[in-house]
């Protein structure tokens, strides 16, 4: 089950009470005070675990509390510190108190102190004085801290796939990565985000995210895509997946509508570096002309390159995809325009190298 938002209550432990006791030994008639200090309450930490990508483990478990400190003992023995509470979350988890962002947990194995446990109380040995040799008072431990927080997950990926329902995003991510999403010939097959690791060679790999298809009005709450757009906010490069075989909606119109929804949702997201993938090109007769025309629409000059082992008749890429792959000075210009077929794996091998270059 994929869960990306949950409310929980976290609490640190209470400090243990100090001890009231007096030294009692043979031949010692009136021993002095020897009550030990109470142990500090346990702390609460958030720890990032790279092996999980959902908050589902928090469903049904609302309270997360550290242990209380133990009471002080006799003979000046201090009480044991309360056991800490380690709350494990996936990378990309944000912790909110009300509407205010409190913690942003990104790095794997990162551990952040959230709440400090209450201080243990002092034993009566601390209160002996010249005028009070037999103090019968010890401090209580301080209370712990409790907070109601909201966990929001924003998946961390290098490449984010954006497209309309049934554009072939799930097929693509299953073809070039280790992800195994549900694939079927109907809209909204993808109901939750999918993450996949794309291995380019023995030394290089990157993470790709596929979210449910976006429809017109998604930024206003229609469809499924809007609730998951936040999962591509952290991506470095967006890849628009367009269905080149659609007769009712051409690739230019698909692109314009997708970009409009992104701009409405988040200008920052819309301004990310991006490329365009013309999917299902194996069933389009005039794919070369279509690609040239689309490049002209983006004010790009289509160019045939063999640097990435492209299929000979599908080698149209942005000129920036040269060996040095310099950054495009125009942030709104596509880094690449690549025709491919996720079903027949046409140009998908080359796509891995294209995306890796884009990330560099």
UniProtKB/Swiss-Prot annotation:
Record gene name: obg
Any one GO BP annotation for this protein: ribosome biogenesis
Gene Ontology MF terms in the entry: GTP binding; GTPase activity; magnesium ion binding
Keyword Nucleotide-binding belongs to the record: yes
NCBIfam families in the cross-refs: Obg_CgtA, PRK12297.1, PRK12299.1
Residues that coordinate or bind GTP: 163-170, 188-192, 210-213, 279-282, 341-343
Parts of the chain that traverse the membrane: none
Sequence similarity: Belongs to the TRAFAC class OBG-HflX-like GTPase superfamily. OBG GTPase family.
Domain OBG-type G: 157-360
Enzyme Commission code(s) on record: 3.6.5.-
Cellular component, GO annotation: cytoplasm
Pfam families: GTP1_OBG (PF01018), MMR_HSR1 (PF01926)
UniProt entry keywords in alphabetical sequence: Cytoplasm, GTP-binding, Hydrolase, Magnesium, Metal-binding, Nucleotide-binding
Enzyme class (EC, first level): hydrolase
HAMAP family associated with the record: GTPase_Obg
Assembly information from the UniProt record: Monomer.
Compartments where found: Cytoplasm
Free-text function comment from the UniProt entry: An essential GTPase which binds GTP, GDP and possibly (p)ppGpp with moderate affinity, with high nucleotide exchange rates and a fairly low GTP hydrolysis rate. Plays a role in control of the cell cycle, stress response, ribosome biogenesis and in those bacteria that undergo differentiation, in morphogenesis control.
Cofactor: Mg(2+)
Residue ranges of every copy of the Obg domain listed in the record: 1-156
Positions that bind Mg(2+): 170, 190
Domain of life: Bacteria
Name of the protein in question: GTPase Obg
